[in-house]
Structure formats: structure tokens, C-alpha cells
């Protein structure tokens, strides 16, 4: 199985970039993982929220390949404890998911078409995080899940 984190816009904070690099390398010991970046829209400030969501949505939809299992990282999604997320990831591996595609939307969320395309929605917290920070938090949780699956000493209950 391959896991991809699809994000809108590049990561700009150097501390977050360093954390993403660190956890991406760690996750790479367990699964083929990458982060794909959809470029930010040009002149986005001139667009309404609805226009921005629609235009970003079209770019997101183009990045989805046939056979992808699409999971939106969305505040309205299902919440897991870390051990539950690990079991969920392990189940996806066991059913031979080709590519598990997690998507972080732009600042205003997802278009309706993206919601309709998604198979599942997952929430990392009821709290709101920046779209920059959520990238690092997700990759850390993915690493944590694989250490749980492989019985490695990282996660503590």
C-alpha cells in the first residue's frame, strides 16, 4: 500500500518543514509515503470563498487516481484514538488498498464535488489547527500508528 498526503499550498514555516521531513523519513521505514502539493491559486485574494473552494476542488479531483481510497482530513470527520487509527490503517493494508489518499483542503475547506468523491472523512481533533500544522500532526500520527502496529516503543497509553 502507498499512502499520500495531498495538500493545497506549500509549507512555509521552517520548523514545520523540519518536522515533516523527520516524520516522513520515519514513516518511510514502514510504508511508501509521500506528500503531494497542489500549488496555491494565483490571485486567490480576489476570489470569493466559494470560488476558491471550487477551483481548489478541481485541482484536488485531478490528483485523484482510479483505485484511490480518498480520505478527507475534515473537522466533521470521524475521530480516532491513536490505537484505533493504527487498527484502521492496518485494516486498509489487509484489504489491499492500492493507495490511501489523505487530503488537506485549502483555508475554506473542500468543494461539494470533493466531498462527494471522498470515501471517508477523518478528524484529527475537535480543535482547529492551521493547514500548515495539520500536515505535521497527521504525519506524526501516521508514524505513531505504524509503531503501534509493529509493537515498537513510541506510543504510551
What are these regions (language model features)?
Residues 32-33, 39-98:
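S-adenosyl-L-methionine/SAH cofactor-binding core of RNA-modifying enzymes
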Residues 11, 75-78, 106-109:
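Short glycine-rich anion-binding loops that position phosphate/pyrophosphate groups of nucleotides
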Residues 2, 98-102:
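Loop/turn-to-beta-strand initiation segments
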Residues 1-27:
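N-terminal beta1-alpha1 ligand-phosphate binding loop
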Residues 6-8, 36-38, 73, 103:
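Short hydrophobic segments within beta-strands
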Residues 105-106, 117:
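Proline/glycine-rich low-complexity loops and linkers
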Residues 112-156:
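Structured adenosyl-cofactor binding patch, chiefly the S-adenosyl-L-methionine
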Residues 17-20, 82-86, 115, 135:
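Conserved strand-to-helix beginnings and helix N-cap segments that scaffold or border functional pockets
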Amino acid at each position: 500500500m502507498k499512502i499520500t498526503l495531498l495538500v493545497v499550498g506549500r509549507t512555509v514555516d521552517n520548523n514545520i518543514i523540519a518536522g515533516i521531513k523527520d516524520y516522513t523519513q520515519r514513516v518511510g521505514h514502514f510504508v511508501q509515503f509521500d506528500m503531494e502539493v497542489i500549488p496555491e491559486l494565483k490571485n486567490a485574494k480576489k476570489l470569493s470563498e466559494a470560488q476558491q473552494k471550487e477551483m481548489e476542488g478541481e485541482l484536488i479531483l485531478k490528483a485523484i487516481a482510479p483505485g484511490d481510497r480518498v480520505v478527507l482530513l475534515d473537522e466533521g470527520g470521524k475521530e480516532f484514538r491513536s490505537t484505533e487509527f493504527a487498527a484502521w490503517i492496518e485494516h486498509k493494508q489487509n484489504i489491499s488498498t492500492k493507495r490511501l489518499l489523505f487530503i488537506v483542503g485549502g483555508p475554506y475547506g473542500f468543494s461539494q464535488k470533493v466531498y462527494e468523491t471522498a470515501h471517508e472523512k477523518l478528524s484529527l481533533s475537535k480543535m482547529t489547527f492551521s493547514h500548515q500544522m495539520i500536515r505535521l500532526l497527521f504525519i506524526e500520527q501516521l508514524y505513531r500508528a505504524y509503531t503501534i502496529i509493529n509493537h515498537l516503543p513510541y506510543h504510551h497509553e
